[in-house]
Amino acid sequence: MEHIPKSFILNMTSEAKVRMIVQKIKALSEETTSDSPDISWFDAEFDPDDLGPRLPFSTYCITGTAGAGKSTSIAALHQNLNCLITGATVVAAQNLSKTLHSFCPTIYTAFGFKSRHINLLNRKPQIKLCGDSDITAVQYYELSKYWPVIKDIIGEFCKKKKFGLYASMSEEAYRVFGCLGSPQLWTTNIIIIDEAGTLSSHVLMAVVFLWWFFNGWLNTRQYLNGKIPCIVCVGSPTQTDAYHSQFDHSKQQQHVRECDNVLSLIIGNKTVSDYVKISENWALFINNKRCTDPEFGHMLKVLEYGLEISDDVMEYINRLVVPRSKIMDPMQYVGWTRLFLSHSEVKQYLGSLHSALSSNQSSTTCTLFTCPIVCEVFHDAVEEYKEAVNVPSLTPLEWLARNTYRLSNYSQFIDQDMTTVSTDVGEASTKVTYATKFVKGSYVSVNGKTKKCFMGFMGTYAQFKRVLDSESFLDTHGHEQPEHAYAFLCQLLYNSMYNFYQAAVQSDCASYISALNNIPIPEVLCAPAHSELACSEPLNEGEDLFYHKTLPPPTARSTSLANIIAIYQGLKDIFIARMEAATRYQMPNFGYSSFNTFLSNTIVKNNVDFVSAEPISGLLDYASTVESYMLQGYTFSPIYFGKLPLQSTLSKDLRDKLPNLVVRDADGFICCLDNNLTKMTENLESGAQIHMCSVGDYGISSKLAMTIAKAQGLSLDKVAVCFGNHQKIKRSHVYVALSRATDANNLVIDSNPLSNRECEMDICKSSKHIVAALCNPQTLLIY
């Protein structure tokens, strides 16, 4: 039993109670109502401040200590129930997608939120809530805040979907229809939201309302049968707060304030908690399985439950403290992720890191390089905007300076070390180019739905053979159109054969060359002129006969899948045979020597500039936002990323300035990332939408440093936390930062904020409800 990880044992002990969660949620999803809301209420004139019919719903909460297995328990629901699984954020959604091997959208995507809704102003409800307000009043109070967005979503939905579309569909046909594609709000009544504690409270009622509206409009079987939506909220109400931001156009200022989150509304609002019977519908995960150190786990429980911090816990946290200068020194704790409270601190650290690297350019593994970020502000749009918001003196550059924060939030380039390098004021637009610095060999994550194009492999011979033997690449990329994955590997294998011949020539070993030439070549690889006896024509023994006897692999579209698989197997056998020959004639540890292969001849200039002899047309996929990619450099070579957008929002001269970043994934494959083109639209109170600006950047965030808020939900191997000189540090900040660690021995902090009485007593309001739930026999506790 010694070799079995503690985390595995902890997960297995919770398995029986996870089954109970599945059974409870299934029972909730089968509840019905005889009073389904009539959606004719919600016409163009409807205002939630005037109230409307009750929107029945049920809720099940899954909360607990960070790293306790809340998110992974969703896998059991995914396997046993027809449910729509979503994440509160892109990171949470992608994390689920990776765990479940199935696409999981964000909850915003699931209910129809679009980028144009970002700047729609939330309004102030006119409904007055008092202590004895019923659930209907609470529902429409929350809906009123978000009504501008909801109204636009239902308007677009009604245009796209015919009224009563599924009214004539039988029960059996509807069940089959629900299994054909990904779950939608109108094909299931179980909606799961991971990291729900980061969502503003109004999102819960928005999901409930839109479920009823979509199903009522389409006349689905679940609506006609009186089914009610079951919202499963997963997360922790004591971690990062939910925030509401509002932009004041007249003052050109962003106002950000804390607000109630979905979990605190369900747990802490008596009207809501009584309605959903929270004491019966709540599961609490107790033990941290991310880091199984007992003292560490005890510390997290103390922080989450708002308990008094004992001398032992305080002493344990104090042992993690190291001098701030060591954390801020880029040459200390190399390879560790730095966590900070603010974006400005992240930017400052990255700047000092880049300065340190620029003074030590002898390293080839950590080369510093720069790439442009481009921004274009349209003059006609600025003029229209100035008139609409009555700010006549506003200039394009002034608008850009005041809105850079909002722009950068779309792609997270706010953390990057940037400097302005050029400003070009033209007739139609003002174009600004920034230079941002990157570190080759550092790890990054992508922030959105970014396309990637596989172009090669860089690693060792043994690593590449391991990928071929395990077929992990084919398992990951060979589901929908396997011929493309096989064709990609065939081309890499075919081009890699030259590496063996080149090594044999350099070693001047005739026996090695002879061994390579004596490896039998399957007939499926042979050129027609060299098949059977025709292959016996005399050739120089010192030449690599492989390329004389074979043809390049066919493209995926030019032959059958069976033929491509046969070619792949033949090339794989030759590759392994050549590796064995190299090990025999060169060195026993040949497999650990450097190995590179690309789709076409590729050179790397200045250690970072990838130049391909031909346009890159590799295997396409989407980059995962939870995977870490190692930066390798950039390329200006033309890349085919599939279907081009119908209309670009950025001038051609600015698009041509942008290279594509080149990254290496965990298996060693080299990919080019598509650039991130963003357009920012101002949504005014009048309903007008003005396309103000377009930005071209790379849509990545550095794993070298990030804010504590961004790190929520991540597991980090080595963590250095700098709380800085902030006057008010929340207890939840300490909790989120420390709980990212997977190993308490690889965790350091610059100070212990809990030694400050104000921080120690900053206890989340939800903590008292969690402690009460621990003492409630009806609450399901999972250890």
UniProtKB/Swiss-Prot annotation:
The keyword Coiled coil does not apply. Its EC number is 3.6.4.-. InterPro entries: DNA_helicase_dom (IPR003840), HSV_HELI (IPR034711), P-loop_NTPase (IPR027417). One of its GO terms (cellular component) is host cell nucleus. Its main location: host cell. It is found in: Host nucleus. It comes from the Viruses. One of its GO terms (biological process) is DNA replication. Keywords: ATP-binding, DNA replication, Helicase, Host nucleus, Hydrolase, Nucleotide-binding. One of its GO terms (molecular function) is hydrolase activity. ATP binds at G64, T65, A66, G67, A68, G69, K70, S71. Component of the helicase/primase complex. Unwinds the DNA at the replication forks and generates single-stranded DNA for both leading and lagging strand synthesis. The primase synthesizes short RNA primers on the lagging strand that the polymerase elongates using dNTPs. Possesses helicase-like motifs and therefore may act as the helicase subunit of the complex. Belongs to the herpesviridae helicase family. Associates with the primase and the primase-associated factor to form the helicase-primase complex. HAMAP family: HSV_HELI. This is DNA replication helicase. It comes from Alcelaphine herpesvirus 1 (strain C500). The gene is HELI.
